[in-house]
Amino acid sequence: MALLHSGRFLSGVAAAFHPGLAAAASARASSWWAHVEMGPPDPILGVTEAFKRDTNSKKMNLGVGAYRDDNGKPYVLPSVRKAEAQIAAKNLDKEYLPIAGLAEFCKASAELALGENNEVLKSGRYVTVQTISGTGALRIGASFLQRFFKFSRDVFLPKPTWGNHTPIFRDAGMQLQSYRYYDPKTCGFDFTGAIEDISKIPAQSVILLHACAHNPTGVDPRPEQWKEMATVVKKNNLFAFFDMAYQGFASGDGNKDAWAVRHFIEQGINVCLCQSYAKNMGLYGERVGAFTVVCKDAEEAKRVESQLKILIRPMYSNPPINGARIASTILTSPDLRKQWLHEVKGMADRIISMRTQLVSNLKKEGSSHNWQHIIDQIGMFCYTGLKPEQVERLTKEFSIYMTKDGRISVAGVTSGNVAYLAHAIHQVTK
């Protein structure tokens, strides 16, 4: 009690001599966070919120990055339902996973990405850890670079890139740079610009590459272009950091979608790789991903794994178990794996079909523009080439929602609304 009274006395004395201190203490007591400003809304979530408020029966949400069936409904893969039933029947426990995750899931993920007969897997010169989907894989990778990549803090991102790449690497303490990627004049790959910029990247820097289905443009290099990019990356001694969120979902063929990653490794480039099962298995809310580092030898891989575990432990201790069990069950069960590959191809084919139907309907509308880029691009997203003012008209006049850069999620297009979309686009572009 004496201490309490003496503390009040000293506080009163301080306030008497320094009125400002009393005011500061009072403000602090009322709110520790008065200085915190309102953050900007997420642009994609903002699109969804505006869509929900719209009462137009023909409204379309082309901003969401999740697959929809041809009725515009969320889609749970039948193979996932079967895997869930098998897991439930085993009456498994809910104990913690190891820090690195479910071992059989990690092994199966590496095999899916690199190919089952890859020399890297046979020699054991790799490490794969389970992560909290692709975002978690990127953050673990970025944090590993920040702590152990001693050559440079610079990470070169394609321009444009997925919006979350920037804060992930920035918040991990890396410095952000860019290289040319998308050509707005052709709505295609700026191969010349990309090669010129990559050639000028300082040696021992990090370059981020989208393995397939580039987000947000849907523009991918062709195999011969990938070969030249790999040559430049190797010549300049750059570290290749691959983000592969759409394996199988881009072309419908998982091996084709992983071609660039495998080619780089074949050329002697020891890459790291982020994987996600959100899109290709529809496990969005399960948060299932993996991070792989290809090393010089098995001994180096063990050292890298030990440090990845040390990074993971204070972040989230260990990853969630349910989604990893689902993915692992599918990948390691021959019948389920075969069914899943068929379903992935079905999703990819529907998106490819919607691209073709959209262009066909634009032609029927009498559009004189060249829309071939919509067909040439690949994956869930499409850079339409629409200008911000045209996007605004689509929203106001037709209740069609997308981000201001004209990016659309083709998964939101169905056989029931593709004609309406084509009509609206024609009206704002003619």
Curated annotation (Swiss-Prot):
InterPro entries: Aminotransferase_I/II_large, Asp_trans, NHTrfase_class1_PyrdxlP-BS, PyrdxlP-dep_Trfase, PyrdxlP-dep_Trfase_major, PyrdxlP-dep_Trfase_small
Residue positions where 3'-nitrotyrosine is found in the record: 96
Residue positions, PTM Phosphotyrosine: 96
Keywords tagged on the record: Acetylation, Aminotransferase, Cell membrane, Lipid transport, Membrane, Methylation, Mitochondrion, Nitration, Phosphoprotein, Pyridoxal phosphate, Transferase, Transit peptide, Transport
Subunit relationships: Homodimer.
Family: Belongs to the class-I pyridoxal-phosphate-dependent aminotransferase family.
Protein name, as recorded: Aspartate aminotransferase, mitochondrial
Gene name for this UniProt entry: GOT2
